[in-house]
């Protein structure tokens, strides 16, 4: 039977909202119950200690996840479903709301898309003239540098879907979001090519493990 301490995260969420909870408290709500000799709060802390972070837990594969005492295939399936629902929610939010009005949603969307990638992925969000999402495309994979990213391919795709604006994004698997000189050079080349076709590059976001670096917010566009 769960003790009062085990119920605290649920009560805290109802009183203060989910943002007020720590990682282990959120995980405890997801797990719901502990195992023999280990109440859910303790289990949650043990799981996070084992993986090292919430990020590592969420990006673990089935074998690694289910190898931890107290976790199993049911929780793995539920977690995968929750992650996918989050991605779809954010995408639907972006389809219905002008992106420029909600930059935090864009960051969250890109984090869910790219933060777990082990290789660099270059993604482009194609937007209409009201800055609503038309579609997203992963255009380039592998080491992202000037020779690997082709502005003409991006502009060709933008013209095909009648995009009026673009948001560029790529991840740094290292987790370090500071842009390199190559990142800045790529951005400038794409921006110059887009301007020739009267297409606006709104931002270039570098995605790390838990946050994003915005070129626009740092006056690099």
Swiss-Prot record:
PROSITE patterns: MPN, UPF0758
InterPro entries, A to Z: MPN, RadC_JAB, RuvA_2-like, UPF0758, UPF0758_CS, UPF0758_N
Domain of life: Bacteria
Keyword tags: Hydrolase, Metal-binding, Metalloprotease, Protease, Zinc
Amino acids binding Zn(2+): 170, 172, 183
GO molecular function, one term: metallopeptidase activity
Residue positions of motif JAMM motif: 170-183
One BP term from GO: proteolysis
Segments forming domain MPN: 99-221
Family of this protein: Belongs to the UPF0758 family.
Protein name: UPF0758 protein CGSHiEE_07200
UniProt source species: Haemophilus influenzae (strain PittEE)
């Amino acid at each position: 039977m769960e003790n009062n301490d085990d119920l605290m995260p649920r009560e805290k969420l109802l009183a203060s909202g989910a943002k007020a909870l720590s990682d282990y408290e959120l995980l405890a709500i997801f797990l719901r119950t502990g195992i023999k000799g280990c109440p859910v709060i303790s289990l949650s802390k043990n799981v996070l200690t084992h993986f090292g972070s919430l990020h590592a837990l969420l990006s673990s594969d089935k074998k690694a996840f289910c190898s931890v005492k107290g976790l199993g295939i049911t929780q793995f399936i539920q977690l995968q479903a929750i992650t996918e629902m989050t991605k779809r929610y954010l995408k639907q939010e972006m389809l219905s709301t002008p992106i420029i009005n909600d930059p935090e949603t864009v960051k969250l969307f890109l984090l869910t898309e790219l933060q777990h990638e082990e290789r660099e992925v270059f993604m482009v969000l194609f937007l209409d003239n009201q800055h609503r999402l038309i579609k997203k495309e992963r255009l380039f994979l592998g080491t992202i540098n000037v020779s690997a990213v082709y502005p003409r391919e991006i502009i060709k795709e933008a013209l095909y879907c009648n995009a009026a604006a673009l948001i560029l994004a790529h991840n740094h698997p290292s987790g370090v979001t500071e842009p390199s000189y190559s990142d800045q050079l790529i951005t400038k080349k794409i921006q110059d090519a887009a301007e020739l076709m009267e297409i606006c590059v709104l931002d270039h976001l570098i995605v790390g493990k838990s946050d994003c670096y915005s070129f626009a917010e740092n006056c690099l566009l």
